[in-house]
Amino acid sequence: ILYAREIAAVAMDPENRLECFVLGTNDLLKESRARALDNRFAIVPWLALTIVAARAFGLDIIDGVYNDFKDEDGFRKECEHGRTLGMDGKTLIHPSQVGPCNEVFTPTDEEVEWSRKIIDAFSQPANAHKGVITVDGKMVERLHLVMARRTAAIAHAVREIDDWF
């Protein structure tokens, strides 16, 4: 954790193939001697630090495992927590975790609809060079357009995978 930035910086080397951080939250608990509480309060600062380091160098980041694979509600809550913090997914240890994890980390219909509205609004000729516009009465900046495109891309990728099965 102390060297998260330096490790993430390796991704800038074209000879390197670092694309993603995968967190070992059990290892983090062991080494820090923190208590494994449901809200992960004790390790949130370290999770946030690794997320910031990963993002600074364009890396994805996958949250650590949830040990009680029979506790779907607890697992779902931890997935929600990870997604809220900015994680891209979660390490899984049991087939029963696949469905809930996919549900949490897949953009909702509402998120996709909002993203499409933002994309459509900025694609209008009158808005093509604006930095800030209004969509449904809300201020939206170009940074929201970047976020909307990412959400739309994830939703599209999930649909393509679903079409395979």
Regions found by a protein language model. Name each.
Residues 1-165:
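Expand to "…catalyze enediolate/carbanion chemistry for C-C bond making/breaking, isomerization
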